[in-house]
Amino acid sequence: MAKQLLFNEEARKKLLSGVEQISSAVKVTLGPKGRNVLLEKGYGAPTVTKDGVSVAKEVELEDPFENMGAQLLKEVATKTNDVAGDGTTTATVLAYSMVREGLKAVAAGMTPLELKRGMDKAVAIAVDDIKQNSKGIKSNEEVAHVASVSANNDKEIGRILASAIEKVGNDGVIDVDEAQTMETVTEFVEGMQFDRGYISSYFVTDRDRMETVYENPYILIYDKSISTMKDLLPLLEKIAQTGRPLLIIAEDVEGEALATLVVNSLRGTLKTCAVKAPGFGDRRKEMLEDIAILSGGQVISEDLGLKLESADIALLGQAKSVKVDKENTTIIDGSGKSKDIKDRIEQIKKQIEASTSDYDSEKLKERLAKLSGGVAVIKIGAVTEVEMKEKKHRVEDALNATRAAIEEGIVAGGGLALIQAAAALEKADLSGLTPDEAVGFKIVRRALEEPIRQISENAGIDGAVVAEKAKEKRGIGFDASKMEWVDMIKVGIIDPAKVTRSALQNAASVSGLLLTTECAIAAIPEKSSSTPPAPDMGGMGGMY
């Protein structure tokens, strides 16, 4: 296929246009008075969202070069969401400002690599300032504040999440589901989650969420790889007679065995899902044993004299339900005996006490949390399906933000931590930088003002005035929902430090890539063939 190439200024202009379009769509959602964005779906009602990453994911531009710029900015939002779970709109606004000002500097003849070096130095100082001013969160009230701010100032969501985290602990698993009623409720169930997803996406049962969900499944726990069908067939035939689904946890499932399981799942003959066993080496054996005890099954292992081909249904674990996505597997309400589970928990606690290695101790604590923490299921209720999906998005955002806050602490929200990091950059000594590096440094300093400007403008206030005043006194910022100046942390307008830090680092990373781009290559769009319609057959009058 033939390709088209753009170079230098021409390429950068097109990329900037794409970046600008996606930024314009995303930035309107920022802050307490951010606006909604409507997303058209292929079927049903449009989705209403204020979630930056959901908006970014929908953007596909017609021009291939503009689309490249948009996709790079989409990467900023997605990466920030993956690492910190929130801050996608902030990251997008920061990146657009850096790209816009950076490309102006390149057009004026400055060296892109030196600009990037200056930007990296500024980001390092700003990140350090954010870390130094972060404050650890301890109380349940502070957890609720973080959650409600991330959920667009919804106090009810903050309260629900704080109560769930208090119940299952910081490392416990919290699942967000749709309720069948208008009420939003929280249920606590015993369960375990480990970081392995489905081996093949063909096992997925819910295409919208890309998840496999099975009720009342059997659980096969095997400590080796399964590649041939003959070993597994006798057991599958017995399970098929029961009509219940099967979750297979093994070192790996590949080749003929995987193909057969996929075909059976797609046909509906036997609902199955295969996942790789968690952990490595001896730790994997211990984790498989944990799963077996929780589900009331047994690890099928030749070390114990058990072979897969002669395994019986009695050796399989069971659970009320399992949920598998591309990264995690959650086993809810396993059928294991509570005495066996308690004994296992006590055994792990003794191992933690005896452990001399910090790493081993940390891994043992993770296993303990999985066995004893259980799973909190938050069921989101709303009047309409559109409202329910929008609320569910906000709850998922808030949960991620809260976890990030527990991990790295909190900073003042509302863009204040970033603009006060900009104030720290103003005091920095630039004498050791080249002129072009100094410009790169100032580009970041200017970009750090952009989130507070955008929050103010979304609330109908002049952003430049708010930005200048916000630099005056540390901790005092503009509450856009009440339109007043307040002590941000005291009134609970807070952001997780991890979210703010990740947004800045990811924005600077992608901006640097765009600034140092000299050539863009894209496929030439195919022209649709416009075949003229066949002429009517003249002279055929009188025929019926």
From Swiss-Prot:
It is found in: Cytoplasm. It catalyses: ATP + H2O + a folded polypeptide = ADP + phosphate + an unfolded polypeptide. This is Chaperonin GroEL. Keywords: ATP-binding, Chaperone, Cytoplasm, Isomerase, Nucleotide-binding. GO terms for biological process: protein refolding. This is one of the most abundant proteins of T.pallidum and is highly antigenic. ATP binds at T29, L30, G31, P32, K50, D86, G87, T88, T89, T90, G414, D495. GO terms for molecular function: ATP binding; ATP-dependent protein folding chaperone; isomerase activity; unfolded protein binding. Forms a cylinder of 14 subunits composed of two heptameric rings stacked back-to-back. Interacts with the co-chaperonin GroES. Together with its co-chaperonin GroES, plays an essential role in assisting protein folding. The GroEL-GroES system forms a nano-cage that allows encapsulation of the non-native substrate proteins and provides a physical environment optimized to promote and accelerate protein folding. Pfam families: Cpn60_TCP1. NCBIfam families: GroEL, PRK00013.1, PRK12849.1, PRK12850.1, PRK12851.1. Belongs to the chaperonin (HSP60) family. GO terms for cellular component: cytoplasm. It comes from Treponema pallidum (strain Nichols). Its EC number is 5.6.1.7. It is an enzyme of class 5 (isomerase).
